[in-house]
From Swiss-Prot:
Belongs to the transferase hexapeptide repeat family. One of its GO terms (biological process) is lysine biosynthetic process via diaminopimelate. One of its GO terms (cellular component) is cytoplasm. One of its GO terms (molecular function) is nucleotidyltransferase activity. It comes from Erwinia tasmaniensis (strain DSM 17950 / CFBP 7177 / CIP 109463 / NCPPB 4357 / Et1/99). The gene is dapD. This is 2,3,4,5-tetrahydropyridine-2,6-dicarboxylate N-succinyltransferase. It catalyses: (S)-2,3,4,5-tetrahydrodipicolinate + succinyl-CoA + H2O = (S)-2-succinylamino-6-oxoheptanedioate + CoA. The keyword Oxidoreductase does not apply. CDD domains: LbH_THP_succinylT (cd03350). The lineage of its organism: Bacteria, Pseudomonadati, Pseudomonadota, Gammaproteobacteria, Enterobacterales.
Length: 274
């Protein structure tokens, strides 16, 4: 694996000079191998190690290099044709392979090669970009988008129209992460490498980026870039110091543990916030 990483790192340093015409065999094979490993879930752009999320930047570099070495090509689709550098993940799947891998794909869901979809996942008409990882038992609902390199945990529900931000560039930026057993409400947007920690519930229409204040009304604490585990979050506003205006924020209205979350309906949690 280290040899593979070394090839990617060296090629990335001279990426400006690499084209589909002059890319050598070693680079092509290395990039193809990485994309295949991402596609199978053997590698992932980010993973939790000793309780901390670690981003493997060299894998992002491999994805970016794939755009340098590949030309656009005609891609066949269900009702149309497309023209892009990245083939669709399921282009060569037959019924046996779908059954073996154990997930459902509802047309016209679009999933790019180099993303991983785990068993017992349901993809409604949605979009999953290259480098993304969607773990077991999750639902990507209608018109939801999982951006490049985003990490979606086990038993996550991404409701209709949810946007999970992607990140390939700038290179040092970390991917957006939704940990296990989270619920993201309809039309919410989680972007810019924000981490929603395990067991959290995000209400409908909540927008969270790195600069969004995440206000805990019980403690008065303000978080940035991280929703603490077990949070129930709704959209709100915080007043300015002089009270002349207010600015949007996300509000943690309560905390729930895994036991409460498993026994209580999502709607009930969001209705009883007073």
């Amino acid at each position: 694996m280290q040899q593979l990483q070394n090839v990617i790192e060296a090629a990335f340093e001279r990426r400006a000079d690499i084209t589909p015409v002059n890319a050598d065999t070693a680079i092509r094979e290395a990039v193809s191998q990485v994309i295949a490993l991402l596609d199978s879930g053997a590698l992932r752009v980010a993973e939790k190690i000793d309780g901390q999320w670690v981003t493997h930047q060299w894998l992002k570099k491999a994805v970016l290099l794939s755009f340098r070495i590949n030309d656009n090509q005609v891609i066949e689709g269900a009702e149309s044709r497309f023209y892009d550098k990245v083939p669709m993940k399921f282009a060569d799947y037959d019924e046996a392979r779908f059954k073996k891998e154990g997930f459902r794909v509802v047309p016209p869901a679009a999933v790019r090669q180099g993303s991983f979809i785990a068993r017992n996942t349901v993809l409604m008409p949605s979009y999953v970009n290259i480098g993304a990882y969607v773990d077991e038992g999750s639902m990507v609902d209608t018109w939801a988008t999982v951006g490049s390199c985003a990490q979606i945990g086990k038993n996550v529900h991404l409701s209709g129209g949810v946007g999970i931000g992607g990140v390939l560039e700038p290179l040092q930026a970390n991917p957006t992460i939704i940990e296990d057993n989270c619920f993201i409400g309809a039309r919410s947007e989680i972007v810019e490498g924000v981490i929603v920690e395990e067991g959290s519930v995000i209400s409908m229409g909540v927008y969270i980026g790195q600069s969004t204040k995440i206000y805990d009304r019980e403690t008065g604490e303000v978080h940035y870039g991280r929703v603490p585990a077990g949070s129930v979050v709704v959209s709100g506003n915080l007043p300015s110091k002089d009270g002349s205006y207010s600015l949007y924020c996300a509000v943690i209205v309560k905390k729930v543990d895994a036991k409460t979350l498993s026994k209580t309906g999502i709607n009930e949690l969001l209705r009883t916030i007073d």
